[in-house]
Amino acid sequence: DIVITQDELSKPVTSGESVSISCRSSKSLLYKDGKTYLNWFLQGPQQSPRLLIYLMSTRASGVSDRFSGSGSGTDFTLEISRVKAEDVGVYYCQQLVEYPLTFGAGTKLELKR
């Protein structure tokens, strides 16, 4: 199985600042069609997970342009600019290159007081 690693379990950030959340894969997620099959999700408090980014860098419908995804075949970054209170929650990356589809353990974004 492909192992997805998110090293940072918690990421404290000040409102209004930018933050980067990282993720890496044990195998390249660049498929033969030239697309990179990595998703980013946000699970807010008492909410279901919501898709933010697919194909590594494409924002899902309705997602703010404050969110951007980038990376290579194995190393990925979700950048959030001008962090707001509504951005708090657990961010997960997911690979879709091969079954079983696997997720990282998640990175919890918390606002500093």
Swiss-Prot record:
Disulfide bonds join 23-93. Residues 55-61 are annotated as: Complementarity-determining-2. Residues 103-112 are annotated as: Framework-4. Pfam families: V-set. InterPro entries: Ig-like_dom (IPR007110), Ig-like_dom_sf (IPR036179), Ig-like_fold (IPR013783), Ig_sub (IPR003599), Ig_V-set (IPR013106), IgV_Light_Chain (IPR050150). Gene3D superfamilies: Immunoglobulins. Residues 40-54 are annotated as: Framework-2. This is Ig kappa chain V-II region MOPC 511. It comes from Mus musculus. The lineage of its organism: Eukaryota, Metazoa, Chordata, Craniata, Vertebrata.
